[in-house]
Amino acid sequence: AIAVIANSKNANTCNANGVEIAEETSKLVASALGIKPEEVIVASTGVIGEPMSIEPFQTGIPNLAKQLSAEGHTDAATAIMTTDTVKKEVAVSFMIQGKKCTLGGMAKGSGMIHPNMATTLNFITTDVCISAALIQKALSEIVKITYNCLTIDGDTSTNDMVSVMA
């Protein structure tokens, strides 16, 4: 994936039009950024089972695309907060064979329990040159001992996710 679009207030799951809304959202983002719809990750958090309208995406995505910048990480980390009391973002640089590499991440999730679940959304990016198979293996292994150990109320949300883009 090349882009992520996240919304809050509506989980876009267990409703009549969730798949269609997600597909149309990815098309809108792709059009605004000049990429393919399959290169867009769509993430949603909020109330489960509510109908969702495409209209906020139709009006909001063009404006969001214009505001994209390399310095926008803090705005993005703040924007995905729901009941979080602090934004969660980090970036580190390190050397691999004499080349400077960067790994960054942001997350949303704290104690949002409505209805009876908590959603965490996690987005990791890196400029490390790594194959899709190797990064998937690394992500799967680390998720087992970190992300999958989180619990707030004992339930997994329909929308919990962690993604990595390299």
Where do the language-model regions lie?
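A structural signal for small-residue-enriched, beta-sheet-centric alpha/beta enzyme cores
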Residues: 1-20, 24, 30-166
